[in-house]
Amino acid sequence: MNYINKCLLFLLVSVSFVSIAQKKGDAKSLFEYQGRIEKIQDDKVVLIGSASSVSFDFKGNSCSISLQSVENHQNYVSLELDGKYIGRVRIEKGDVKSFPITVSNDNKTHHLSIYKATEAANGGVLFAGTSAKLVESATSKKKKKIELIGDSITCGFGNDASTIPCGSGEWYDQHNAYWAYGPILSRSLNIDFVLSSVSGYGMYRNWNDEHLDEAIIPDVYENLYLNRDNSKPYDFAFQPDLVSICLGTNDLSDGDGKKTRLPFNEEKYVSNYIAFIKTVYKHAPNTRIVLLTSPMVSGEKNVTLVKCLKKVILTFESDKKHKPIALFEFKSMSPKGCGYHPDIADDKVMAEQLIPFFKKILNEK
C-alpha cells in the first residue's frame, strides 16, 4: 500500500479526532500551511519538504495533535508554541497517533506550529487533526517571501544530536529543519519561507554519483515530492520575493573514495546552473536570485566555486527582464554537526551572516 492510500485509510480512522470548529465545516480558514505540502481532504495534509508546516490558533489549555509517519520508519516534527520552540517529536511507524501538547493553565488563545524536521527523502508526515478548540487567527500582515534551494546544509541534516548521538540510529535521526539556517533567518526577518532541498544532491552531480544512477536538483525541483515522480508537479503558488540557491558542495565533493569520481567539471556545473536559473525564472519571474557559496567548501575548491558562480552571474548581466543576480560568500567554518555538517550553533552563525544581506535586498524597491 503506498503512502497516499495509507493516508486516506487513516483519515477515516481519525474522523473522531477533530475539533468542534472542524465539524462545523469552517476549519478551512483556521489552518495555515507553509512549504511543500499535499492537501488530502478535510484540512488533513501531508508535510513533505524540510520545515513544511501546519499552524493554527486555539483557545484553552487542552490540545493534542494527530500525526503519522506515512513511511515504514520513524519520522520527526518540531513544535513551536506561542512563538517558542518546545522540542522535536519522534513519530514511530504505524497508525495515526495522538500527541498531547502541554499548555499553560489559562483560557488564552495560543498558536501552535508543527514543522517537519526531516526532509522529503524521508517520506511524508501526515497531520490528521487536532482536539483543540480552534479559533480564527488574527489577520496577519502580508509578509515577504523567500525560497531556499539547496542540499543537506539547507535541510538541516545532522544538526541536532540532542537525543541520538552522531553515528547512531538512522541517517535522518539528527535532522532538525526548524533549526536550519533558512528557517532561522526567516523567523528573524519575519518572512514566509519554503525549503526546496535534498541531501546529497548537486547542480550537475551528487556527492557520490556522476548523475548516472541518482537525480540532481534540476531533475526534481519541479516535482512536488522532490523526487523523480513527475505525476504530482509542484504548483509554484508560493511566489518568493527572493530565491536563495546554495548548491555546489556535493558537486565539488570527492565522494566516498570507493566509487569512481571524475574531476570537477566547471563547464557542466556552470551550464547546468544557468539552465536551472532559467527554470526558477519560469516559475517566479519577478523574484530576486542570490547565489550562495558553501561554508563547507574552502581553499582551492572555494576559489573554483566562486569563479563558477561569477561566470553564472555574468551570463545574466545583460538580462533586463529580471533583477540582478547577487552573490553571497559564507565565511568558512569547521562544522560541528554529524557527518561534517553544521550543527544548530553553526546554522545560527550562517543565519547571522545572511540576515543583513537578505534584509537589504528584501527592502530594496
Model segments located where?
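Positively charged n-region of N-terminal signal peptides that target proteins for export
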Residues: M1-C7
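N-terminal secretory targeting modules
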Residues: C7-V13, S19-I149, I153-Q174, L362
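Conserved SGNH/GDSL esterase-like catalytic core that processes O-acyl groups on lipids
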Residues: S50-A51, E119-N122, P165-P263, E267, ...
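Surface-exposed acidic, glycine-flexible loop patches that form ligand/cofactor-binding
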Residues: E136-T139, N230-Q239, K278-A284, S318-D319, ...
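Structural recognition of the beta-strand scaffold that forms the well-ordered cores
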Residues: K145-I149, T154, F193-S197, D241-C246, ...
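A structural motif corresponding to the C-terminal end of an alpha-helix
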Residues: Y181-D192, F276-R288, T315-K323
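Extracellular serine-dependent O-acyl
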Residues: T287-T293, K301-C338, I344-K365
